[in-house]
Amino acid sequence: MQLEVILPLVAYLVVVFGVSIYAMRKRTAGTFLNEYFLGSRSMGGIVLAMTLTATYISASSFIGGPGAAYKYGLGWVLLAMIQLPAVWLSLGILGKKFAILARRYNAVTLNDMLFARYQSRLLVWLASLSLLVAFIGAMTVQFIGGARLLETAAGIPYETGLLIFGVSIALYTAFGGFRASVLNDTLQGLVMLVGTIVLLVGVIHAAGGLSQAVDTLHALDPKLVTPQGADDILSLAFMTSFWVLVCFGVIGLPHTAVRCISYKDSKAVHRGIIIGTIVVAILMFGMHLAGALGRAVLPDLTVPDLVIPTLMVKVLPPFAAGIFLAAPMAAIMSTINAQLLQSSATIIKDLYLNLRPDQMQNEIRLKRMSAAITLLLGALLLLAAWKPPEMIIWLNLLAFGGLEAVFLWPLVLGLYWERANAAGALSAMIVGGVLYALLATFNIQYLGFHPIVPALLLSLLAFLIGNRFGSSASQATVLSTDK
């Protein structure tokens, strides 16, 4: 173990727990559900931008994405910039309308919104189960990424790192709730920004300058400096699929959507769009360029996902590497706490309280259950991450795609199409989810497109056809989640 690397990381974790304790003490008056899962809808613009960005930027962006850039070259850096409008799309399309309706219905979760709009218990159960299955896959990826970071950069055995990482996140999320999550996201967003810039400068310096780094890549494989990338992987169909999966489809991610119902006012969302887009641009460009140029410094890595943690140790002094280790750790932690909290909210609010509505005001029981379920989910994820695959980006994209295939059209059409009904939404969710699962499982790529493209197209068609066989439900005027 390298103490110079570990000490700054321990200090960072202490700060994270300190923020969580502060958040617990700052809980405002109101019902437990609204405060614990939404922070009483009090986010300002900077916090909104940072939490949305930190939630979106995950192990895939700090570990898997740069790993792919290492393997395929500078073309992957250009591909990564396709994600630039993600915050603008999320807040622009969902933002105001979603927040207004959420306040009208007193919605705490995404499924509250779906029930208020479609008045279908079956739809809520299907959405809840889909969310839990996909989130378990997505969070497993984050746990693997965190443990690999500690293994490579700090010399901590994978299993030990997994325990340290998993227990820390489960504890601070369980007891701090949404307020702790978004405050830590803001801290983690700042850490990511500084860390990304420092590492990129270090990589360019170690490679002998930008020009020398590109020349080295060209000598290794001329395809590494072409827009198509190594193995000509970046075809038009691939790039279109990637844009749908990691940019447009983000609108349908539940942990992103829930951020759109928890901000304070219109000024916050406008500021959030501007700041969030700038932060995403810096992080995506910086991390992926560091991964691509890292091949000029480390040409012989056998596991591409190890490029960022290995570069940290190679190009930075040990203490600086420890400080920077907090950046990808921050990216991973912020994504997990958002998904962990959303999973807990789904089990408590959408499943348990649907079966036991008489427990809505039993705040003592709800507090205990929320913490216990969050800790239990954390333990299950530790078990799932114990034997990891080689490249985590594909597993992460698989989980992302599943969520988008199920939630995108019921969300967007539910907001903007008055005639949308439960029959259409259920048809879209079933067709999108099942088709995506089949295509992804058997690796079927029609005309070279990722499964998310045909899944979303046929899901939309299923919505339109199914909608003709249903009738519009009267929308709820208020949901009994708060008084």
Question: Where are the regions that the model predicts?
Answer:
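Membrane-embedded helix-loop-helix hairpins and adjacent transmembrane boundary segments
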Residues: M1-K483
